[in-house]
């Protein structure tokens, strides 16, 4: 299934790719970029931009800053997750801190989820 996207976001998506957070950069270069399952950075899906997306596993990987743990951020994340789930996309969320301090554990969880979704 082809996912909807907002073509008006293209310049913003390019900007996000050039200006990744430290956590996003670490995860991308240390694990996702060399991963045998192809990931896309800053994937536009409908009104949202996913930090990382693996089409073969229909998996979104989100790296969350502190604003995601405030009530408004949690409500927005819940709406975003529900929207993505309607397209069969599973969302994995990690904090910036998790990625920076436990990259190996984060990578293991991503790999476990990919294998579970592809070979279900």
Residues covered by each model-derived region:
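Nucleic-acid endo/exonuclease domains
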Residues: 1-120
């Amino acid at each position: 299934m082809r996912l909807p996207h907002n073509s008006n976001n293209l310049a913003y998506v390019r900007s996000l790719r050039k200006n990744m957070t430290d956590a996003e950069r670490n995860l991308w270069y240390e694990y996702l970029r060399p991963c045998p399952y192809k990931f896309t950075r800053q994937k536009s899906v409908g009104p949202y931009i996913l930090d990382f997306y693996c089409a073969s596993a229909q998996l979104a990987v989100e790296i969350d800053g502190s604003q995601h743990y405030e009530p408004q951020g949690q409500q927005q994340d819940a709406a975003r997750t529900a929207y993505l789930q309607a397209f069969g996309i599973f969302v994995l969320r990690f904090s910036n801190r998790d990625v920076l301090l436990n990259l190996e554990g984060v990578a293991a969880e991503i790999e476990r989820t990919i294998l579970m979704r592809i070979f279900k």
